[in-house]
Structure formats: C-alpha cells, structure tokens
Amino acid sequence: MNFGLFFLNFQLKGMTSEAVLDNMIDTIALVDKDEYHFKTAFVNEHHFSKNGIVGAPMTAASFLLGLTERLHIGSLNQVITTHHPVRIAEEASLLDQMSDGRFILGLSDCVSDFEMDFFKRQRDSQQQQFEACYEILNDGITTNYCYANNDFYNFPKISINPHCISKENLKQYILATSMGVVEWAAKKGLPLTYRWSDTLAEKENYYQRYLTVAAENNVDITHVDHQFPLLVNINPDRDIAKQEMRDYIRGYIAEAYPNTDQEEKIEELIKQHAVGTEDEYYESSKYALEKTGSKNVLLSFESMKNKAAVIDLINMVNEKIKKNL
C-alpha cells in the first residue's frame, strides 16, 4: 500500500484564500522531507465557488513541483471535457520535463451540468467528448504529435513541445465519475481514482464493473493501482472530529447534491471516512480499500482545525508506514 495526500482546498466562512493555499503548501513542504514516506500529492479542480478554490490544478501542481524535490505531484481531476486537449498535453509534457518525471496526470470528465453549459459543451455527447479529448492529449504525450478529425475537433498534425520525456510512462489516473467512464478506463487498463463523495457501495460497484469489463476485453490489470481518497479527522473527542468534518464538507455537499437528503449524506460519509478517535477508523478504512481494489490511499487532513494536531497525526501515520516498509 502506498500513501499520498490530496487537497480539496475548501475555503470555509472566516478563512482567507491565502490561509487555505498556505495550508496545502506547508503540508506538502513538510512531507517532502526525506524522513517521510508519503509518495504523492494531488490537487483538486473546482470552479465558481469556495467549495474548492483551485480552478487550475496543473498550475498549482507546477508550483508545488518547483517547491519540492521528492514527492510526485499532480492533478487529482484535471477536467478534460471542458478544456482543450492540446493545451493539457502541452502543459503535462512541460511539467513532466521540468520536474524530471515527477508529474502525475489525473484526469476527469466534467461532473457539473453548469460547467458543461458555461464552457459551451454539449451534455448529450459528454462521454464521446471525454473520450475524444483523451485520445488527442494521450497521442500528444506518448508520440509527441497529435491531430483531430472528429465531431468535436478538427486540426492538422501538430508537434507538442517540449516533448514529454516519460511518454507512455507518464502516470495517469481517471476519476471514477460515471459507469461509462469506468468501463472505458477498464478497456484501456487505466487506474481509477475514486471520488471521496461517493458512497462505499458506489465505489465497490465501480470496481466490480471495472473487473468485469477488463476481463471481457482481456486487459491485464495486474499492475493497475486504483486510488482511494480518505478524509481524515482524528481527535480524542470523537464528537469534535465529526463536527469539524460536518462543517468542512457541508457546503460542497449542498452544492453537489442539491436533490438528496444532505444531512443523511454527510453522516454516511463520516461513517465511511477516517473520522473519530484513533481506535475507530482502521478496520473500516481497511475494509473500504479491500472492497475497491485500491493500492494507493490518499489522505486529506484539511478538516482538522488544530494544525499542531495535524502534524502529530501525519507523524503518527508516517511511523506506521515506516514500520510496514
């Protein structure tokens, strides 16, 4: 099992954007030190509200790569359906070369109808647009060239500069946003990053479908390493841990799930993430990782208000990782 971090960068009431971003920067600078055994860090993409204030995760990743020496850093969910695939290929290739292969490209379909409309994309062909975008940018990364002649893009063969030095070895992950995306990823043998806001049952359904489709298409998934994002808030007082998590995710849940029982959704997520006392999270987290075939666990400590306690918890997790190396 490999461990990394992910950052949602929610700006809660009373917080400044500087404080939110500084928290991410300081945490990554801490775990980049040689004595830490976290391997990766990922930045979430979100638009138009404070429920995630980074709209350009690859830009944030470029700063963090320049700040660090050891960690592999990338986008958690760079949305490709609403961005031009050539620009993504160019940026990914540049970051790959400048970071000496430490950049990770996490990709996603769009999960917001408003964003699809805002960026003038057609909802009824969303899956096809996602797939077309991926083929273009992946060609650019792996062959240094790409062209398009489809329903969405039409341009002659062009060169991607600078060339991506990692090419097919540039690590890619696909956010599990729908069953269609999961089935497509399985056919290509691309690893998934599960959504933190999906229930465990939804994640498990995606994993089982991934296994089925991969088998039907004779795809070898021996080395596929799915990623499980885990929200963490550990406190000697479980009530404090749970309330801090409620306060942290409530705004996003209200925005992303307007037609559900939001309080019920929040309580369900609290049960399925690492929230409570030190003795309460291990078995449930281990069970979730097994049920989703996850080989990587990504941790977010952002809901914890006591930053000294966050450092202590990171150090505790690091010692446990070290003992199991």
Curated annotation (Swiss-Prot):
CDD domains (alphabetical): Alkanal_monooxygenase
Annotated GO CC locations: cytosol
The enzyme's E.C. designation: 1.14.14.3
Annotated keywords: Flavoprotein, FMN, Luminescence, Monooxygenase, Oxidoreductase, Photoprotein
Any one GO biological process: bioluminescence
SUPFAM superfamilies listed in its UniProt record: Bacterial luciferase-like (SSF51679)
Gene3D superfamilies: Luciferase-like domain (3.20.20.30)
Claim: Cell membrane is one of the keywords in the record: no
MF terms in GO: alkanal monooxygenase (FMN-linked) activity
Catalyzed reaction equations: a long-chain fatty aldehyde + FMNH2 + O2 = a long-chain fatty acid + hnu + FMN + H2O + 2 H(+)
InterPro entries recorded: Alkanal_monooxygenase, Bact_Lucif_Oxidored, Bacterial_luciferase_CS, Luciferase-like_dom, Luciferase-like_sf, Luciferase_bac/NFP
Transcription regulation in keyword set: no
One Pfam assignment: Bac_luciferase
Protein family (similarity comment): Belongs to the bacterial luciferase oxidoreductase family.
Oligomer and partners: Heterodimer of an alpha and a beta chain.
Primary role: Light-emitting reaction in luminous bacteria. The specific role of the beta subunit is unknown, but it is absolutely required for bioluminescence activity.
Protein name stated in the entry: Alkanal monooxygenase beta chain
The species this protein was found in: Photobacterium leiognathi
UniProt gene name: luxB
